Amino acid sequence: APCTYPGQQCKSDDECCHGTCKTAFIGRICMR
């Protein structure tokens, strides 16, 4: 499955291409 890039919404760390899934103002996004 394709991975989620930084700045895009995610549900868990393992979805992210880089870094981790963190809570932001717009919901949870992948961050380096």
Curated annotation (Swiss-Prot):
Function noted in UniProt: Not toxic to mice by intracerebroventricular injection.
Reported tissue expression: Expressed by the venom gland.
Name under which the protein is recorded: U21-ctenitoxin-Co1a
Species name: Ctenus ornatus
Localization per record: Secreted
UniProt keywords, alphabetically: Disulfide bond, Knottin, Secreted
Annotated Gene Ontology cellular component terms: extracellular region
Domain-level remarks: The presence of a 'disulfide through disulfide knot' structurally defines this protein as a knottin.
Keyword Phosphoprotein: no
